[in-house]
Amino acid sequence: MDSMPEPASRCLLLLPLLLLLLLLLPAPELGPSQAGAEENDWVRLPSKCEVCKYVAVELKSAFEETGKTKEVIGTGYGILDQKASGVKYTKSDLRLIEVTETICKRLLDYSLHKERTGSNRFAKGMSETFETLHNLVHKGVKVVMDIPYELWNETSAEVADLKKQCDVLVEEFEEVIEDWYRNHQEEDLTEFLCANHVLKGKDTSCLAEQWSGKKGDTAALGGKKSKKKSSRAKAAGGRSSSSKQRKELGGLEGDPSPEEDEGIQKASPLTHSPPDEL
């Protein structure tokens, strides 16, 4: 037999050494983009569109809550001890300052609803996932998760970042919010602040996203439950007022008075005498 060519024999001898070197080499580290992609699979921080959307939502709510008062703020003393004209609180600088200083703290009342898509993942109330897990724990089921039970109700990283970005946004666009408050309240705040200024020339698709709600969703049905309670209270109040009117008109209509009712109730029943003996 012919012997194996010299170059081929050398390759066979070097092959085990190459395999050994490959095994000893350290694993390649993930680049920033790859690491960020893996992190985003679990934590997806809010976009600027989502931040502005919920800042506008809470600003609307806060201005609506503070706009129901008729309080007048005094501006000081007038000339020659005359009473100075006051300013309505609803048009005052004080109202604007109080709302903008506390607006970002309101975002900490939100929770992350991972079962929802888009910007609807941010909403008040407990998410369906954690509500189900809490119900299982209360029923005695042992639930094993990477997050300890004590931290289930803690603020998520996404909501904390939502509040952080809110602080920056309100400070950066303070003059825009003030301009809307003084001159453009007839315009929609979301359109004025977000579409026309904060997100001008950028993606505004999240502003049109609305959550329709699902059956049994406590976060979506909170308002409906309160309406039902209020209607029941009104009905109960109507019944009590009508019964009160009937009592007041009882004497005119010839209804028995309470004393007469008491006498009728306390009247002893007729007794039967034993039969006569023959």
From Swiss-Prot:
Residue ranges of domain Saposin B-type in the record: 47-271
GO molecular function: signaling receptor binding
Example of a GO biological process term: innate immune response
Glycosylation sites per record: 153
Coiled-coil zones: 153-179
Family annotation (Pfam families): DUF3456 (PF11938)
Signal peptide annotation: 1-30
Protein name as annotated: Protein canopy homolog 3
Source organism of the structure: Homo sapiens (Human)
Organism lineage: Eukaryota, Metazoa, Chordata, Craniata, Vertebrata
